[in-house]
């Protein structure tokens, strides 16, 4: 991994119920790796980021190479609370979508999932019932020269187009700062009920929204963001 890298950083993501001293673990990993390579620790913009991810059932080890800013998709329109681009890529990778396959985001917002997928060589389809968001996605795609298909329609359109995509990656709207009148927990319940059974799935939502849901066949992980927001990711 570090053969041609001059710099690296270690990052630990704890999705388990165990408590860890994450800064101490990251420092220990960095010290250990430094002893076996010529690469040096660099906290900002390293050549390689090494990840250790803990969950209650299994642990994951991996790495990501430095992404040059000029090669990343650009946005001319963005909005508060939209999905972080790095987390979007994590979700796409977690369900194993490959180049040439197609991802669908039924709550595409300003198009983060579509932009990141296209930049990874994955085709994309987006849905959003909000005309303003639909237009924002269209403008952002056009700016980057991407040809993703987008529909100004409700998420229930998934049922009609399920044969056109291989997986779903989305961040459900929270109700706050959106034009949705229906309660977010009701949206989540209805959304889960229509999910195609044979598709790869990564869904993110606020933890408390799905506390009472039956989630057969879906793995659940939680990411603590700050004291007032813990997100749940469902993976299939």
Regions found by a protein language model. Name each.
Residues 4-7, 100:
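Phosphate-coordination loops involved in phosphoryl transfer and adenosine-cofactor binding
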Residues 15-31, 38-236:
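Class I S-adenosyl-L-methionine-dependent methyltransferase catalytic core
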